[in-house]
Regions:
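Hydrophobic Val/Ile/Leu positions in short beta-strands of Rossmann-like dinucleotide-binding domains
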Residues: 3-6, 64, 127
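NAD(P)+-binding Rossmann beta1-loop-alpha1 motif at the extreme N-terminus of oxidoreductases
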Residues: 1-48
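Internal alpha-helical scaffold of NAD(P)-dependent oxidoreductase catalytic cores
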Residues: 43, 119-154
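Short, charged/polar "capping" segments at the starts of alpha-helices
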Residues: 35-39, 93-95, 132-136
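Nucleotide donor/acceptor-binding cores
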Residues: 1, 83, 123
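Short phosphate-binding/catalytic loops that engage adenosine nucleotides
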Residues: 24-25, 83, 102, 147
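A general structural signal for well-ordered alpha-helical segments in protein cores
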Residues: 12, 37, 71, 135-138
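Rossmann-like NAD(P)(H) cofactor-binding subdomain of soluble oxidoreductases
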Residues: 34, 44, 48-118
Length: 154
């Protein structure tokens, strides 16, 4: 799958490494700080982008790995037609993404992640999509990253 990452902090960095290890492709990285986006993009051979308008339509999944507080504001700026839009927060409802994409959900890592990790331990995920189709794709994607995947419900 082709993935866009929004964010460049701990969660985004570890997810980027996991995504590449699972033989998916991180195609773009966006961050409020372009230097941070460039640094993460370089690690995974992705393209850093300066604005959300530059996001490619070729990606399958767009992951918002930003602070919980930033999710609602960032979601308001996104209008994705076909992509699955995910956030990584356990305390934020998936429905905050409702107006940003018809296909949305949560990919929540049940473990603290640090970008400095040299070895990434097995990370359990809770997932929750807004439809059966999204849940099926999200489950396949999450299982490519981890053996420990469970469904959650808002």
């Amino acid at each position: 799958m082709k993935v866009i990452l929004l964010g460049s902090g701990n969660t985004a960095t570890v997810l980027a490494k996991m995504i590449v290890k699972a033989e998916h492709e991180v195609v773009q990285v966006w961050s409020r700080n372009f230097d941070h986006a460039k640094a993460l993009a370089a690690k995974v051979h992705a393209k850093p982008v300066t604005t959300l308008d530059e996001l490619t339509s070729e990606a399958d999944i767009c992951i918002m790995a930003v602070s919980d507080a930033a999710i609602p504001q960032l979601a308001k700026q996104l209008h994705l037609r076909r992509k699955i839009l995910l956030h990584t927060a356990g305390s934020v409802s998936k429905d905050v993404l409702r107006n940003s994409s018809p296909n949305y959900g949560v990919l929540y890592p049940l473990q603290s992640l640090r970008k400095e990790m040299m070895v990434i331990p097995p990370v359990p995920f809770l997932i929750d999509g807004n439809s059966d189709e999204v849940n099926a794709l999200l489950e396949d994607f999450a299982h490519s990253l981890s053996d420990n995947v469970e469904f959650a419900d808002d």
